[in-house]
Amino acid sequence: MLTHRIPRGVPEMPARRYIRRAWPLLPERDVRDAFARRDVKKNGARIAPADTVRGGDELTLYVNASFPLDVLFDDGHLLAVVKPQGLPVDVDQDGVGEDTLLSRLRAYHENARLLHRLDAQTGGVLLAALEEKTYQNGLAAFREHQLAKTYRAVAKGPFPAATGEWRDYLSKDARRATVRVVKHPGGGAKPIITRWRVLEELGENWFLVELEPVTGRTHQLRAHMAFYGHPILGDDKYGSRETRAARLHLW
């Protein structure tokens, strides 16, 4: 059973939509079956999927659910954990997010602090510090490029060479929660550097590539790849309809 007080300030929305946003990895079938059994309640009263909920309401969902943290490494100072694809790191812009990587981290160790992040639809390994000294040292290591983040993804080809590097600028559109690659600075655009290497041709003009976001801006890899005509398979924000079947993963 899941019992949850919706944070104040969360706007009104249908219960089913809120549940999908609050627990994004909860199987859709479990949510559908709970509503069919009338096992979803708002403030003690049974509700239907279209009934609305808002900040301050208490939501109860009778499902079997667990939210484990996949820990790869823990020496008491540093954690390496796996962020599943589809799990956001933190709550969204409306404050919705009962199950996030941060909530799982805090359940595992109350002092855990992430050293870097991944987009919600990207799965991979993240590092977290368990003490202040490790946290500051880790931030410095990323800032000074002593640690490299490498991604593997399937992207549309063909590529002009086996390896390459792109240097451009990235402009944010906060209202649409997107970014745009531009060739020149100005308007708040920040420099970006992306290195890429073709690992394998998979057929039908798809390639397995290794990507390194040297500058590590928000959505940098997805936007940069799409800008040069190599959208990542599964990218539902910057890719085309044909690319929305899988997701990228950080190794």
Descriptions of predicted regions:
Residues M1-R176, E201:
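RNA pseudouridine synthases
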Residues M1-D33, G186-K190, G203-W206, V214-W251:
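Pseudouridine synthases involved in rRNA/tRNA modification
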Residues Q93-D99, W166-T178, W206, E210-V214, ...:
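A short, terminal or domain-edge coil/loop segment
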Residues N111-L139, K172-Y228, L250-W251:
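The conserved catalytic core of RNA pseudouridine synthases
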Residues Q146-T150, E165, P191, A245, ...:
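Short edge beta-strand segments in beta-sheet-rich domains
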